[in-house]
Amino acid sequence: MKTSRLPIAIQQAVMRRLREKLTQANLKLGRNYPEPKLSYTQRGTSAGTAWLESYEIRLNPVLLLENSEAFIEEVVPHELAHLLVWKHFGRVAPHGKEWKWMMESVLGVPARRTHQFELQSVRRNTFPYRCKCQEHQLTVRRHNRVVRGEAVYRCVHCGEQLVAK
């Protein structure tokens, strides 16, 4: 498990929550699903991801540190639910009815697809672009694609091509 400068108390709280919800699910489902691998390697604005084939949960250490309580209460069960749904039902829609059922009926957690954490500290630089109706912020990756002539982006509202400001 990679720690990425997270206090041990936070890592322990994550493990407690993971084990608590896994035990709860195993009891309700009458199964003995194993504990998933846990790492703190998620980057960017995603709070976490569930890797089905490797049965692993990757958590964002920056967002975890900045939003510990809500993160542990919501994100850990959210990602665990993806793995449990995959084990229980096979490959289904990521946030479909099976996942919602697993979250609400089995894990007892509200089924929310996205987090509401402040992203300023993990958001990368953006580049301003304009169209007829508004200003847009393009990521470094999209900006570089425009500069290299590999992509053209259009406004979803007015349809005009975006131009660097």
Swiss-Prot record:
It comes from the Bacteria. It is found in: Cytoplasm. Residues 20-163 form the SprT-like domain. GO terms for molecular function: zinc ion binding. Its main location: cytoplasm. Binds 1 zinc ion. One of its GO terms (biological process) is response to stress. Zn(2+) binds at H78, H82. Pfam families: SprT-like, Zn_ribbon_SprT. The active site is at E79. InterPro entries: SprT-like_domain, SprT_Zn_ribbon, Uncharacterised_SprT. Its cofactor is Zn(2+). One of its GO terms (cellular component) is cytoplasm. PROSITE patterns: ZINC_PROTEASE. Keywords: Cytoplasm, Metal-binding, Zinc. NCBIfam families: PRK04860.1. Belongs to the SprT family. This is Protein SprT. It comes from Escherichia coli O139:H28 (strain E24377A / ETEC). The gene is sprT.
